[in-house]
Amino acid sequence: MRKWKVDDSVELYNINNWGKDYFSINTSGNVVVTPKVNGPEIDLKQLLQELQLHDVSLPVLLRFPDILHNRIAKISKCFEHAAKEYEYQAQSYIVYPIKVNQMRPVVEELVSHSNQYNVGLEAGSKPELHAVLSLNLDSQSMIICNGYKDESYIELALLAQKMGRKIFIVVEKMMELRTLANLAKRMNIRPNIGIRIKLASSGSGKWEESGGDVSKFGLNSSELMEALSLLEQEQLTDSFKLIHFHIGSQVTNIRRIKTALKEVTQFYVQLIKKGYNIQFVDIGGGLGVNYDGTNSSVTGNSINYSIQEYVNDAIYALVDICRKNQLPQPNLIIESGRSLTAHHSILVFEALTSTQLPAFNDEISIDEDAHELVKDLYEIWDNLTPNRIIEMWHDAMQAREDALDLFNLGLVDLETRALVERLFWSIARDVNAMASKSKHLPEELKRISRSLPDKYFCNFSLFQSLPDSWAIDQIFPVMPLTRLNEKPTCTATLQDITCDSDGKIDHFISTANHEYNLPVHPLKDGEPYYIGVFLVGAYQEILGDMHNLFGDTNAVHVSIKNNSYVIDRVIEGETIAEVLDYVQFDHKRMVRAIEVWVNQSVKQGIITPEEGREFISNYRAGLYGYTYLERTDNVFFSQTKECDS
């Protein structure tokens, strides 16, 4: 048999497609990150070993700020190329909606390039506006105010505009426009007004309903006419400078974007002809990420276009409509959050232990007085052939069902049930192996493969670190980070450490028949098995919840300097005391309660004073420790084992 090569792992995990430009596998079989174009590679195994020396426990979120810079530069370069090709004379702006990832280091890294790349920020709520205004933005950096707004929100934005910030208040509802007009008059400020238009066009993919006639935000055509009347009545027509639309996040199909652009450019033409000085067209978000590497709109986890095509279509739509109608070209704004931030973060955790379904082998003997159902199943297992595979599978299922019924009636003992289970699941494995070679697989045989993978129990919380995986079945690239020069002989689903059966990853990038399982290696005693989840920089951190009180993970910022990597910052994850404080458990009162209980137990002779002191010490240490499982003597619970093929 040919020896497994790194190139085989590259193909198996599809890393060259979803990880293009940033992630690959080196000759040692370790995943490497290349944050800078033509820059040095960072071996993730070496990085994790160094973090261990710094007492940084897993799970950990690895952030690479240089990738953020690269994403901005890439989008900006696409704008430059399109502007040159289509003779676009106006300005283009990249506006980052901070809802995608509000972590201050992420936002600060993006705005540090504001002057060079026309990077601005979008706030969709009062808290987000407060955050944006506190940052050291360039005076010409665009600030877009979206979302529902009350008087205090609008007043804050107007005063910030008066002090020199380039702020646009985008009206989502008629009520907001009335409030804005009243406040602007009272404060004697000429506002920069934008209006979000509710297009008939909608996006595609998981967030399709964010656009279209029934979408949550924006003014339809009738409401827009009402808004125009109010602007004239309040003498604010010259303040109306921006139109905005958003057809949904992660738009998978470029044709939906083209359709929306056609629609919005007609709004631009109509408004200009009515005498409104529209200077900006904000096409919102939607620029997607190729999560599964397929470059297809079919899966729902990828996109069928490139950044360049997206930008080309946007700029061409504006240039073409203006040329045909002899109108000035408006400035273009894109609110790209997912595409900017997704690639820069990797979640890393360890597999703790694993379980697998029982198996039968020739070393197990079947006694002559064994139950008839056991003998029947053994006969099926011993004589299974491809030409009778469906019939024999039906027989096996019937035998198992009969055995379970008899066990429930007390007519079959535990030893017999255990043998039945071993035989049945061994038959299932053999049936699956034979069936996988068939071109036309019956649906009932397809379902077998979903039951067979091992369960790898991993030190993370799906609900805290990958909420979209649970909530909307978002698929992220997942793969082992080491031993990729070895053949992965196991398949597994990944189970988190919450007490919830939903806490698992059982959908993966569909390559080589592994849609419902991940190819992995057998665990080895004393050797950590690292697993990485990639492209998690958008939404996951801020949407995560504290199911079972698992808090934020440790986070590490890694940059490239002087042709090598540097650990810039280690942000400690939440302690048990900190997460308990969220649910109103005061850690000082808790310790006092424990001390009272221990003292009573010592006085009653239930425990010794030494045991009491040890208990209090352990309680305190745990209270101020990590919410996730921590290594003891460099060992978790893993065991060396081979996988059933």
Name each model-derived stretch.
Residues 66-74, 226, 263, 313:
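A non-catalytic, amphipathic alpha-helix used as a structural packing/dimerization or gating element
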Residues 87-280, 289-293, 304-309, 317, ...:
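Active-site-proximal beta-alpha core segment in soluble small-molecule metabolic enzymes
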Residues 1-57, 559, 566, 576-577, ...:
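Conserved, well-structured core domains of diverse proteins
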Residues 30, 38, 67, 101-103, ...:
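Short, glycine-/Ser/Thr-/acidic-enriched flexible segments
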Residues 20, 25-102:
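Low-complexity, highly charged intrinsically disordered N-terminal segments
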Residues 58, 62, 84-89, 274-278, ...:
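Flexible, glycine/charged-enriched surface loops at secondary-structure junctions
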Residues 4, 305, 313-315, 319-645:
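Charged (often Lys/Glu-rich) extended helix/loop segments that serve as interaction or gating elements
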